[in-house]
Amino acid sequence: MEAFRRGERSPAEELEAVYAAIDASPLNAFCHLDREHATIAAGVADVSLPFGGVPIGVKELDQVAGWPHSLASVPLRDEIATGTSTQVQRIRDLGGAVLAGQTTSSEFGGVNVTRTVLHGVTRNPWRLDRTPGGSSGGSAAAVAGGIVTLATGSDGGGSIRIPGGFCGLVGLKATFGRVPMSPNAHYGSLTAVQGCLARSVRDVARWFDVVNGHDPRDPLSLLRVEGWEAGLGTLTDQVRGMRVAVVPDWGDAVVSPEMWDLLAGAADELIRDAGLARVDGVDTGLPRMGRAWAVSGSVGTAAVLGDRWPACKDDLTPEIRASMENNADVYDAHSYALIERKRMEVNEAMAMIFDPVDGVDLVITASNPDVAFAAEGPLPKTFGGIKGGAGNNGKLTFPANLHGNAAISIPAGDVDGLPIGLQVVGRHHTEPLLLELALLVERNRPWPLIAPVVQGAPS
């Protein structure tokens, strides 16, 4: 951005370089390019805006009017968006970003591996045989691989934090409602939030400066908060003394011991550098979601597919097909009420964990139970040699979605060249404090900004 303002490089030149990188990339991070409109936008970009002239990727679950809106699913491959997501509209119109194209996602955003029948396999720029995660896998791969500086993401169960952890990026899951889900916001999506994947804490803060704030089309969206970027580095006194629980197995998760040993060291450093107060013995237990979490996702998928199911089942990715088949018997009001009861149980438990008097201010855990797994899948069932089941892959992240908390994944080192992420979860409305903590990590444990795109295992 500064190079644009100094006249050293133009947005048009940057966009041309982005498209050249996409054409040459082995990552399969993009599934639709809008060269014509992006070229026009780059030519007239206002470089004084926060992201003026900067090409970005747009996750394919977002909407851009006139672009495909397949939700990464073959049965919807001919759908075209008639509106534009509020986040995308704001980052384009208020932020000045240039929409280069659409990044790949897992089908319906329902799996944390970005591999679909429609678009094929998206690969991790740190090792091409590994996944960037999901569902915002294409966005994470594109940013970590140096193709674009930023890309949109969404997080309904970890879909920003999981790929952020796998790809060595900053991934902020904001408080529920921070960024409007419009157009077409609906009460069935009470866990999902909008955001971005970025290499730096400052870019994330600047992004939210642009996109946050109420939209009447989403009645659950929050009022605007100013000063995200300006506040960076000014909140050290506010974070000092915050009570923190370090919980490697949050949500009954199984975590790789080797990975956690490294993350525990990063957690200790953060606690020391920020002056946090570690609290042991606080009950951080959560009710087991069991089948309820899978059923809740399948209900949404069933609503989107409508009469196409079950005739379309052979066109679906294995995990989505299996989820639909396994949960087809519970698509009724009584079963959905049981799901909501389970959500309420989790809400009560989370409220106790973060109780202002008897609880903690922060929970530190991992972003993922292990390093990135095979790009083609399947979802792993063992983690550092310990059995955990396929459902273990999202256990660390979904509690913040169910309760609506703010949470962030921060790059915290690597295991054999594969990035690992430290997840910090706070109360609602604590995003500035989480960004302050991430800034401390960024300054004291700087991470590589762009991954070396390599094939197979590191030498």
How should these model regions be labeled?
Residues M1-G156, A274:
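Gly/Ser-rich catalytic/binding loops embedded in alpha/beta enzyme cores
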Residues M1-R6, P75-E79, A192-R199, M324-Y331, ...:
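Short, well-ordered beta-strand elements within core beta-sheets of diverse protein domains
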Residues P11-E16, G43, E229-A230, P257-V282, ...:
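Acyltransferase
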Residues V18, G53, K59, D93, ...:
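Glycine-rich, small-residue loops and helix-cap segments
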Residues F51-L71, Q238-V247, V295-E348, S409-P419:
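Short helix-loop capping/hinge segments that flank enzyme active sites or metal/cofactor-binding pockets
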Residues H69-D78, S256-P257, F373-P380:
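Glycine/threonine-rich flexible loop motifs
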Residues G83-S85, Q89-D215, N401-D414, L418-G421:
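Short glycine/serine-rich loop segments
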Residues K173-D261, R445-S459:
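A short helix-breaking turn/cap at a secondary-structure junction
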